[in-house]
């Protein structure tokens, strides 16, 4: 009985970890479908305007831009989840342990500096930043590039979606700021359940609201992590005033994005080897010239 309940609990726990990924995927593809509809069906042409070659090219550019961003989001997210950031399968070193090494009683092994245990993943993660609940995976040394690039394209995609949904907001507010329009923008679910709006109006209002809220949240996450990258810090190290691992702006960027940092963000398949191994880190003090003793 205990074994059966244990297996059931493991299944429930596994499903719970996958649920945020599924919900994120549904939201991303719903927004993409809605923006595609706005571009293809609700194109901003006046009734008397005819479709020209330029309008066709413009529509094609719109579709290319949004599916380029969608492809980068899904690909980076997939590689982020698949890339193992933990100490599993990693040779951590010999008997000599340097400064900053600690013993993890959960993993029953010594761990290098900047490595910490994640109780959600139940393993220690190299240069652990935080556990990302949206993807059910820890952000660490080996998958930080995919996490940051995914955030970048999510921010760009949501900004694009907000601009494209401007017509939806204009349509809702065309009769002025009324109780009906405000409620539709703030709580579209209540308006749908109470029968005040159609399913179509609810869908457009809900997705437009999601784009705005999502854009603000992703922008905050992106700018915070860009600041961390430039400072050579993790989220855990942000609270400390010291920055022993900050090697300068360009070196900090290379530490996170790799050798080809300046163009690897365009596509997750572009190779960009990281300069370190996630175990040994240069510190600021090691870059300073040694002072000679004065006799």
From Swiss-Prot:
Coarse class of the protein's main subcellular location: membrane
Residue span, DHHC domain: 102-152
Spans within the Cytoplasmic topological domain: 1-20, 82-151, 198-203
Extracellular compartment residues: 42-60, 173-176, 225-295
GO-annotated molecular function: protein-cysteine S-palmitoyltransferase activity
Superkingdom: Eukaryota
Record's keyword terms, sorted: Acyltransferase, Lipoprotein, Membrane, Palmitate, Transferase, Transmembrane, Transmembrane helix
Residue spans crossing the bilayer: 21-41, 61-81, 152-172, 177-197, 204-224
Catalytic activity: L-cysteinyl-[protein] + hexadecanoyl-CoA = S-hexadecanoyl-L-cysteinyl-[protein] + CoA
Membrane association type: Multi-pass membrane protein
Subcellular location: Membrane
Record EC number: 2.3.1.225
Active site: 132
GO cellular component annotations of the record: endoplasmic reticulum; Golgi apparatus; membrane
PROSITE patterns (UniProt xref): DHHC (PS50216)
GO process terms (BP): protein targeting to membrane
Function: Probable palmitoyltransferase that could catalyze the addition of palmitate onto various protein substrates.
Protein family (similarity comment): Belongs to the DHHC palmitoyltransferase family.
UniProt domain comment: The DHHC domain is required for palmitoyltransferase activity.
PANTHER family documented for this protein: PALMITOYLTRANSFERASE ZDHHC16
Entry protein name: Probable palmitoyltransferase ZDHHC24
Organism: Danio rerio (Zebrafish)
Gene: zdhhc24
């Amino acid at each position: 009985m205990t074994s059966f309940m244990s297996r059931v609990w493991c299944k429930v726990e596994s499903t719970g970890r996958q649920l945020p990924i599924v919900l994120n995927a549904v939201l991303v593809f719903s927004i993409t479908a809605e923006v595609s509809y706005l571009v293809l069906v609700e194109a901003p042409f006046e009734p008397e305007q005819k479709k020209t070659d330029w309008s066709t090219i413009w529509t094609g550019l719109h579709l290319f831009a949004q599916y380029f961003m969608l492809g980068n989001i899904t690909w980076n997210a997939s590689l982020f989840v698949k890339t193992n950031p933990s100490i599993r399968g990693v040779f951590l070193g010999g008997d000599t342990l340097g400064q900053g090494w600690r013993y993890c009683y959960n993993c029953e092994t010594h761990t290098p500096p900047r490595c910490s245990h994640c109780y959600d993943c139940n393993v220690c993660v190299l240069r652990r930043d935080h556990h990302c609940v949206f993807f059910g995976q820890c952000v660490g040394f080996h998958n930080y590039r995919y996490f940051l690039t995914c955030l970048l394209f999510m921010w760009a995609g949501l900004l694009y979606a907000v601009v494209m949904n401007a017509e939806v907001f204009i349509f809702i507010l065309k009769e002025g700021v009324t109780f009906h329009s405000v409620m539709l923008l703030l709580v579209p679910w209540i308006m749908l359940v109470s029968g005040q709006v159609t399913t179509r109006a609810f869908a457009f209002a809900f997705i437009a609201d999601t784009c705005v809220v999502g854009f603000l949240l992703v922008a905050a996450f992106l700018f915070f992590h860009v600041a961390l990258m430039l400072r050579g810090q993790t989220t855990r190290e942000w609270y400390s005033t010291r920055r022993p691992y900050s090697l300068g702006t360009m070196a900090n960027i290379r530490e996170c994005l790799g050798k080809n940092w300046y163009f690897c963000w365009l596509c997750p398949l572009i190779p960009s080897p990281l300069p370190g191994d996630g175990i040994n880190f240069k510190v600021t003090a090691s870059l300073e010239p040694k002072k000679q003793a004065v006799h």
